[in-house]
Amino acid sequence: MRNILPDYVLRLAEMCLRITGKPLYAVGGIVRDFLAGFPLAGSDLDLCAPLPAEEFSALAQSAGFTINAVYKRTGTVKFSVRAENAGEKTADFEFAAFRRDVYVRGEHTPTQTFFTEDIVSDAKRRDFTCNAIYYDIARDCFCDPLCGAADVKEKRLTCVDAADKVFGEDGLRLMRLARMAGTTGFTPTEDTLSGAKNNAALIADVSPERIYNELLLCLNADERYGVKGGAYAALSLLDKTRVLDYIFPELTAGRGLAQRADFHDHDVLEHSLRAAGYAEKSVRLAALLHDVGKSEAFREEGRFASHPQRGEAIARDILTRLKAPARITERVCALVKYHMYDYDLKTKENKLRRFIVEHAEIADDLLLLKQADYSACKDDLSTAPCVKRWRALTDKMKGEGVPFSLKQLAVKGDEIAPLLPSPRFVGAALRALLLHVAVHPQENTKERLLYLAPKLCAAPALETR
């Protein structure tokens, strides 16, 4: 492993051993990834030693590193160095002194920290044995106090201590378990699964922001190492441990809710998890939530017809609760609202043309969502009929020169403003012109649009646009 580490880290480790007599270890993800044969690009290089933070900080500074922060309570040092190759960016590192942590049940941050020189105690403050393998940089050897290397070899996720204790200490580990399973393809042991399920309620003690961030990592789990089906594996584990019940009770209300057998092989919840798994990265969150309105619709109406509209409102509540960015919330809600549009292929072409232009900003993602939805019905990876139709029509419209944005219209707002009763009509008039030429692209000329603008403005529909 020595040959994958930068020279300046090797020199720091050798200096640490020579001056203090204590080894400097690499630990965590980079060691696990090396032993598992995963790509190391993007792996964090976390360092640790049986050494006080202040002593390590002074040592690193004397070796030419920049000290960015020292946290005495946790024994953590954040430091950086400019790479020797001038073309490279500054490299950031984190050091942690060997320690033992004490938690209030379920909280993410330890309430007490005790420093130690015992590597076993330090290993047992971590989450899974595969993340508790130490590499002695100067001596070029591994130290494996909890037999994590065997778990890496067997692709197992085993807790560093009794599973009830590990998950009971830190509720966020419940989601980290799912993320790790998705990113690595490792399988949790039965004890690990049981401990997570027993402590699932502790996820409620974790801040919404942390839950949202971990959820995104789960949704993108297959991106890290290219493990096929990683997103679905992560979400399925959240379901299996019942953590999903506390994060998305509106979604898990679909567990066991059957759908038409001629269209679906799975209940509403499983269909949603599979849709997220089949979806492209940009629409996975929308795919997870696309049918979130079905349970409410069925409960109140005995049918699913209104689920897109109900789902939009429910998705907004969920994403607001998780404090997702407003931009993400609006986009996901729009996709949920329209994911069933033209599902039966009966929408008239002119109406569909106007819809595609009016929703051009989400049209590509809407097709991706429709495809994921279709694939998740019966695990059919062929192109969805609706997607075929929309793509063919979109190509046809592009060939005809249909404008898909106001910028592509042959007139500007200041050109039609003098022709309208009031400046307040300009925006609505431009949108009306855009929808008109979606059906009549040959009329996207300045002369024709200047003629049409006041006539469209006089139309009653414009008053409500």
Which functions belong to the PLM regions below?
Residues 1-465:
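Catalytic cores of the polymerase beta-like nucleotidyltransferase superfamily
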